[in-house]
A protein has these predicted regions:
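Terminal low-complexity/charged segments
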Residues: 1-150
Length: 150
């Protein structure tokens, strides 16, 4: 039976009560915040296998240098079965600046994670081909970081 995005978000929260913040709905969209980024892969696998989020539409990152957890990663997931979209967010510190790759769960994560690595410097553990995608090897900066010299 098809579910609403709110129903699915509440199921996610019920399954991971200690690490998923209360889902936030705004204008028909639903955002779930993962409080423990070390468990990203486990949560993403549950979303794919148990809640039918079979497509990663987009992965991106936000640089907030004044926060202790400087980088926020944002994943836009889509369920073709339920016909709903869910946003999953988690934050990491600049050091070590690493998070699990989701490329083994969704093939679409491969190049998106490479782009985040190239432009923000975030490392994706267990990525099959983590190398720069836009800038050349040896380029000393990550152009989307706030301290990028203009």
């Amino acid at each position: 039976m098809k579910k609403t995005v709110k129903d699915l978000a509440l199921r996610l929260k019920a399954h991971f009560p200690d690490i998923i913040a209360e889902p936030v709905e705004f204008r028909g969209e639903c955002t779930c915040t993962l409080l423990d980024s070390n468990r990203l892969h486990e949560v993403a696998e549950y979303l794919r296998d148990q809640l039918d989020f079979d497509f990663l539409k987009e992965a991106t990152s936000i640089d907030e240098p004044d926060k202790p957890l400087r980088f926020t990663l944002v994943y836009e997931l889509y369920s073709y079965y339920h016909r709903v979209q869910l946003r999953l967010k988690t934050s990491i510190a600049e050091v070590p600046g690493k998070i699990s790759s989701l490329s083994d769960l969704w093939a679409s994560a491969n190049w998106q994670e490479r782009e985040i690595y190239d432009l923000m410097g975030i490392q994706f553990e267990n990525h099959p081909d983590l190398r720069r995608i836009l800038m050349w090897d040896g380029y000393p900066f990550h152009p989307l970081r706030k301290e990028f010299p203009l």
